[in-house]
């Protein structure tokens, strides 16, 4: 039986190749996270930064810049020697593996972190692509409705929901082969997200100025 080609209906001009579709476990490797609580973090004493699952759920957008001031530091007395090989890089992805609502599984893509020291913290699943991806593409795809529909039946728990590494590995990742097309898609969704945020801020100000 001939394999059906994955060709989106809407494309940027100049791109015609079918998209790839591969299992998560084929194109990502898992990294090590730590289990530091909020008590081990601060915002005053510069040190190694730490991405906490709660911040992924509440504070961070799909694309996270390493210079973001909402990323806390790890207290200087904490021994981080065993995490020396777990420092994050540009393009790495971090999932929140637990939540009290349907935001479980939210993912962020890291950018501008290569010159920094950043680790993945409590209740997170950090992973690194094994193949190149265009800037911004994965952060948007992994939070898209089509991907999150795959996650929904894999979530466990009632009051507190969670998702596991083993569940993620069989989900399907869809992407254009061309990195330029990937980056155009990433840029488009970044622009849309910024416009939505700006509109929400304007609506908030308008409400309280009346």
Region locations from a protein language model:
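Short amphipathic coiled-coil heptad-repeat segments
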Residues: 1-17, 201-210
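Extracellular/lumenal glycan-associated surfaces
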Residues: 8, 26, 183-195, 199
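Non-catalytic DNA-recognition/assembly elements of restriction-modification systems
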Residues: 11-40, 179
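Loop/turn elements at beta-strand to alpha-helix junctions within RNA-recognition modules
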Residues: 17, 156, 177-179, 192
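Short, tandemly repeated low-complexity microdomains enriched for cysteine and small residues
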Residues: 22, 63, 198-208
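DNA target-recognition domains and sequence-specific DNA-contacting regions of bacterial/archaeal
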Residues: 28-175
